[in-house]
């Protein structure tokens, strides 16, 4: 049928060819027929000689792809009744070549006429639409399954070289792919930045089937799709941030090699995915960030828990056209032994599931812990001085520009109203309280529960940060020529190489620290879920373009980031879990060079659990993880890398890493605490003896505990009670800080001498103490055998603090001394109390105005 030139070009483009190729072909054949134009392109007479199938291009309609994978389900061959084996695809090209029959009609669109049969050359091009052509050179096609099984790795290496510029597979990647080739499920645990993504990207290129990847974040899926397009792999993502409904329709027609989808969406798409598996084939279901499956993990997501529907709905016993179950590959960088077991059970993976483990040890990461009162802005100057000095060395060429940028940024009125040259500090000069109230009002309208300091929690992250309004969710496979056009970094970008990410617990801190860093001349940006999406996208882009030096962020930032030149990760405040810490710290040093991972924490205070929506069971687990973080920070004698690696169940091969602060500075001197431990244990034992016997069996009065009011309060005295009684009985330890005794109690608990009295409620550190049988045997009152221990961080901190008095009693006695009284009064006069006006935006402020109307008039 003859068509006009424009219609003919449109029809050829919808088949999947480039528009320029179509124009040239139509012009060459005189616009006579579609068949002639297609044949002209396929014979290599056109401009580039390249055939681009629809699966590798972003077409505008909901059309179906060309070739074997687009054949209607009614195709007469018996092979179409079932999804073939993975290895069948290794020889499919050879089989198609031998067949004498022609292909059936190729459906392009319901309104288009069928394309007639083409020559043998056309059939060769159409059959392996998704196949990696470089893996199947002429004359080297496989003839049998055994040959396919023995040579698949060679083909993978060819794909790696041609598509990704990688010479060969790593050992864990080879093991994971071997498991997939054997049609078995797999759980891959590999360190961040080790190349887990290749484990599920290769199957799509190797077989020509579709790979479905479940991923938790839209931003993560967006980045992955963009990277794949640069490697000539077509991909799309489906989820709440996907605004184009046509993309889902095209994805379910098999038009993309890899489909990224969020867990909430994949449950809805079970039926369309089953149809996709029947018509085109699904090579693999990959569950990225699989730790989100486990309720014991640090990043549990309820919708991940529902992914067991994949095993239930894509097994050979339920679908007749499947010869084997569609393999499931779960991947994560952080999972303890308990989390691993929970993942396998929750996903209903088979008993033959292979667990692929790599070492969690990253030798180029230097871990350290430093004391800081992170809640106070007065600590910023001391804590970030090294950071300022680091970037000041590179400031000579850009110093003047930074000053201008800082002034310009103060004039901005919106977090997103800046160009690529502006610093990401916006209207920080506004009243901080008004800014917080406006953010709270904005978020409360969405029905979100936020704490006073706008704490980041799981729900908030995935609902706010990840709901980006992405303009395009499908990504074309870019031609090779585009891959070579890698932009050369400018001198300015080179000066900014070596980025820093500062993780903070609250949104307020992210803004305050970013403001401070901008004030001292650094190029910094705040990133948290309450900021406008435009600002977040700009920060994300500038971070990747090396236009920033520091990003100050909550946990909303960083998942899936593959930035090679991050030189320092700072956690400013206590951690919530070691899993999250190791994952976030692993974003540094991905180029293999040395990188620092520093934890700043107030070692004088135990961490508190950030508020979030948790069940009672999850709360107990959260406290356990918080306690592990606390002990990690207090450690002064054991290699930090060893602690982290063994936390994930891996046996650390060497005694130390020789790079963390403990290994480089060495542990503190051993201290004999036999006397202190015995004394504390005696006080504890005496109390419990009287409580248990409720008689005169124990000389309770001898320890000053006889008529204590605390004894009547549920018989549950806390550690501070015992410390106060110990001080009363022993003048020698009257000046010893409570912080030191807390550290000693923690050591005694670790040794098994004492334990928590109440096991119902989880706590970060021991509070209600009772002695153990081991303690009664080991801590013999008459035994003078020394008990040497390494003082922990809080114990060392207490020894450094200058104390002029011991406790509140000593402080109160100081008022009786005329000189001390005079000094204290002078300090008050020098720093008069600031009169605070009532804040009418708060209930307390409005009430104060009504009760004290004269204050508001002043």
Curated annotation (Swiss-Prot):
Keyword DNA-binding: yes
Compartments where located: Nucleus
Cofactor(s) needed for function: Mg(2+); Mn(2+)
Domain Helicase ATP-binding: 177-353
An example Gene Ontology biological process: DNA recombination
Compositionally biased region (Basic residues): 830-858
One Gene Ontology cellular component: nucleus
UniProt catalytic activity: Couples ATP hydrolysis with the unwinding of duplex DNA by translocating in the 3'-5' direction; ATP + H2O = ADP + phosphate + H(+)
Extent of Polar residues compositional bias: 437-448
Its EC number(s): 5.6.2.4
Chain residue ranges for the region called Disordered: 402-450, 822-858
Domain UBA: 2-44
Biased composition (Basic and acidic residues): 416-426
Keywords of this entry: ATP-binding, DNA-binding, Helicase, Hydrolase, Isomerase, Magnesium, Manganese, Metal-binding, Nucleotide-binding, Nucleus
Domain Helicase C-terminal: 491-627
Cited CDD domains: DEXHc_RecQ (cd17920)
Gene3D superfamilies according to UniProt: DNA helicase RuvA subunit, C-terminal domain, P-loop containing nucleotide triphosphate hydrolases, Winged helix-like DNA-binding domain superfamily/Winged helix DNA-binding domain
Gene Ontology MF terms: 3'-5' DNA helicase activity; ATP binding; ATP hydrolysis activity; DNA binding; metal ion binding
Tissues expressing this chain: Mostly expressed in roots and seedlings, and, to a lower extent, in leaves, shoots, shoot apical mersitem, inflorescences, flowers, siliques and seeds.
Family recorded in the similarity comment: Belongs to the helicase family. RecQ subfamily.
NCBIfam families, alphabetized: recQ_fam
Role played: Plant specific, probable 3'-5' DNA helicase that may play a role in the repair of DNA.
Protein name: ATP-dependent DNA helicase Q-like SIM
Organism expressing this protein natively: Arabidopsis thaliana (Mouse-ear cress)
Classification lineage: Eukaryota, Viridiplantae, Streptophyta, Embryophyta, Tracheophyta
